Amino acid sequence: MLRASRARDETSLVEARVVSPYPPRDPRDPRWSVNNFNKETLLCARHCGELLAQWGRGRSLSSLETLTSVTMRPQVSVLLLIWLGVLGCVGAEFFTSIGHMTDLIYAEKDLVKSLKEYILAEEAKLAQIKSWATKMEALTSKSTADPEGYLAHPVNAYKLVKRLNTDWPALEDLVLQDSAAGFIGNLSVQRQFFPTDEDETGAAKALMRLQDTYKLDPDTISKGALPGTKYQATLSVDDCFGMGRLAYNEGDYYHTVLWMEQVLKQLDAGEEATVAKAQVLDYLSYAVFQLGDLPRALELTRRLLSLDPSHERAGGNLRYFEHLLEEERQQTLPNQTTEAEPAAQDGIYERPADYLPERDIYEGLCRGEGVKLTPRRQKRLFCRYHHGHGTPQLLIAPFKEEDEWDSPHIVRYYDVMSDEEIERIKELAKPKLARATVRDPKTGILTVASYRVSKSSWLEEDDDPVVAQVNRRMQHITGLTVQTAELLQVANYGMGGQYEPHFDFSRSHEQDAFKRLGTGNRVATFLNYMSDVEAGGATVFPDLGAAIWPKKGTAVFWYNLLRSGEGDYRTRHAACPVLVGCKWVSNKWFHERGQEFLRPCGSTEVD
């Protein structure tokens, strides 16, 4: 085990932020009030006079430099009390020595100088706050003009969460160094609605999910060079460092390496940052060690020590890495004919194995790769007018129907919902949106899961006439009754929103999944696309090699059960992560009960 082992939480890790040698004091802390400055805190008056005299003669004075680094209220108090100490020294027979008096002259001059430096520091702080306000004003003007369009770019979404969870609190700390009760009061009220650390973690993981699914390198994401993007958005060095640090804290060394390498790339390009290169190398060396690349871990540690020779832990790690390499060399000497493993010597590492067996197929389909829509299959797909099942409304105004897949039969209908209906459905759903859940196969209880990242709500017909209208339309199109169907579910996929491969129907070991409903299994799925998606967001069927892309106003329909009532395992499907855009869908799950005469059983088990 690495001698100087590092815990994943930031408290035991070597600080991942630039830490001032003199951290700012909180003016609200009673320890820094005037009343609590005693002799031990401030030095005695005579000692202060002597220190000031030394400083006036140009000598090094680290203790006074420490005192002048504190924040506004303590610093003014310190300066005043030091000056009182000087006066005390004068009263203590300083006038008897012109030499002492001249020292005081220099001391007073330096006091004025330090006071001006303090004022300049406060003005610089104010200028920094003004610059931030100007930047935020321009940014919010752009974002509020088209919130969904702005957030359609995943980098914008990530940076919004990061700003509210990290940057605004940092600004609060800066403002707290001065009197700003009005701003702090307002910020304190607003902060209860700010994203949390969990939100920032989720946003960062979403970017990494997009990175993996669509094979994007960190440089592409950092530059914001994504397809279909409406707004330019980039990641700074510190943003990239935040991504890498989060991956590190999650034990995800694969992404730690990718993002820390991006940090180094941008630092080498001359970008300004608060993070130091030594800190980046610290994370990177440990991450590549965890990935098994000992030679590179050694090389990175040497680079770290060249920048910070006093880094004790790095020195210990260096000796340990050298020891491990020597052990490996000794072990390979008797078998020199054996080919050395080409393990990541070029700094390229394999993505860790995943819990999802069809991960590669699923993600390939999301990218439009591996779609098995052969010319032979295409010949079996047709477009037609759908008149329903003798429904009078559809005889007068049939729907355009297009085959998306032949077996199992998956069809798309056009102009199913109007723009007005879509907006009304979204308006009804937004106040009710909550983290989408999945049904635990063992307990039947609904719970959140990392493989389903979206928010959803359920709408009843009594909520608005448009809900009843859409329900009736789906009934007319499918020829199935909605009386035993589930409520209309509306889902919104944000940045990196997805639903990994799953079945809509309950399998044999999940017999209690829909027991509470008392309507049997989910016989069919009707999925409405209520938005266009600039990039990503396809509905894919890994076992089929099918990919269906969202198109606003259209809907896709398929049966989950064979006519025998057995589940059709070919319908295992997924909602791909949204790369660019905002994906809105609504779906209706039809159940078995009530469909006996509308979709009767077939003559064989596989019908």
Please place each PLM-identified region on the residue numbering.
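Classical eukaryotic N-terminal signal peptides for Sec-dependent ER targeting/secretion
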Residues: 2-7, 41-83, 276
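Small-residue-rich alpha-helical packing segments, especially N-terminal targeting/signal peptides
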Residues: 3-4, 9-22
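Intrinsic-disorder-associated, low-complexity terminal segments enriched in Asp/Asn/His/Tyr and depleted
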Residues: 9, 22, 26-29, 35-38, ...
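Generic short amphipathic/hydrophobic targeting helices enriched at N-termini
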Residues: 10, 14-15, 30, 66-68, ...
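Polar low-complexity intrinsically disordered regions enriched in Ser/Thr and small residues
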Residues: 11, 31, 49-52, 59-62, ...
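Generic N-terminal simple sequence motifs
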Residues: 17-26, 39, 58, 70
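The N-terminal extracellular segments of secreted preproproteins, especially immediately downstream
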Residues: 21, 31-32, 43, 47, ...
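Fe(II)/2-oxoglutarate oxygenase catalytic core
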Residues: 71-557, 561-607
